[in-house]
UniProtKB/Swiss-Prot annotation:
Residues 1-16 form the signal peptide. Its main location: secreted. GO terms for molecular function: structural molecule activity. This is Fibrohexamerin. It comes from the Eukaryota. Produced exclusively in the posterior (PSG) section of silk glands, which are essentially modified salivary glands. It comes from Bombyx mori. Keywords: Disulfide bond, Glycoprotein, Secreted, Signal, Silk protein. GO terms for cellular component: extracellular region. The lineage of its organism: Eukaryota, Metazoa, Ecdysozoa, Arthropoda, Hexapoda. It holds the Pfam family Fibroin_P25. It is found in: Secreted. InterPro entries: Fibroin_P25. It is unclear whether the N-terminal residue of the mature protein is Ala-17 or Gly-18. Silk fibroin elementary unit consists in a disulfide-linked heavy and light chain and a p25 glycoprotein in molar ratios of 6:6:1. This results in a complex of approximately 2.3 MDa.
Length: 220
């Protein structure tokens, strides 16, 4: 009787188990050598370059904010805490032949003198300038590698998520015109910041992956 019950239970378990999951996790999330070797085995990247500095400066970084018809340029952009980013997800989907790599970056800090050019039909740009220092509780970067594209990071799509909410920031106008223009209405700040981080997503993800895990040779 017991043997019959076990047999029935085994059949029930097999029936409820369904097809095997296509998700395969080849590495522990903190095993960067394993992740690096896995990426290198599926691409042309060179593993193990080192680490991003805790602080570094980029002379000029331009990004677009389409919602506000504006182009922004960060001058002498200082980035802090990029070295604190950590891998929070890494898996292969054997069915779709894609690999997902997510990186969580807590308290990224950006400091720069920022120029804004707002574009309008039939008019020249309105150009403004201000100092800004912003700290972001958590920026989450998810990159999807495609085996059909040889796991090419340089053309892979990265999604940027303000997972920790809006930044804590300080702004100081560089001239009177900018002081009069800057709005104290922050109703649309979430739209601006989503587009801002979208504009920086490739640089943030690709520089971390290439410096910390495997160098794909991207021009960020």
């Amino acid at each position: 009787m017991l043997a019959r019950c076990l047999a029935v239970a085994a059949v029930a378990v097999l029936a409820s188990a369904g097809p095997p999951s296509p998700i395969y996790r080849p590495c522990y999330l903190d095993d960067y050598k394993c992740i690096s070797d896995h990426l290198a085995a599926n691409s042309k990247c060179i593993p193990g370059r080192g680490q991003i500095p805790s602080q570094y400066e980029i002379p000029v970084f331009q990004f677009e904010i389409p919602y506000f018809n504006a182009t922004y340029v960060d001058h002498n952009l200082i980035t802090r805490n990029h070295d604190q980013c950590r891998v929070s997800e890494f898996y292969d989907n054997v069915r779709t032949l894609k690999t997902v790599l997510t990186v969580d970056c807590p308290w990224l800090n950006f400091e720069s003198n920022r120029t804004l050019a707002q574009h309008m039909s039939f008019k020249e740009d309105v150009v403004l300038s201000f100092y800004i220092n912003g700290s972001y509780p958590l920026i989450r970067l998810t990159t999807v590698f495609d085996k059909g594209n040889n796991f090419d990071l340089c053309s892979a799509f990265t999604f940027a998520d303000l997972a920790g909410g809006l930044p804590i920031f300080h702004i100081n106008p560089n001239d009177q015109r900018t002081a009069q223009w800057l709005s104290k209405d922050l109703t649309l700040l979430h739209i601006y910041e989503r587009e801002h981080i979208f504009g920086k997503r490739n640089w943030l993800a690709r520089s971390f992956i290439s410096r910390t895990l495997c160098d794909f040779g991207c021009q960020h």
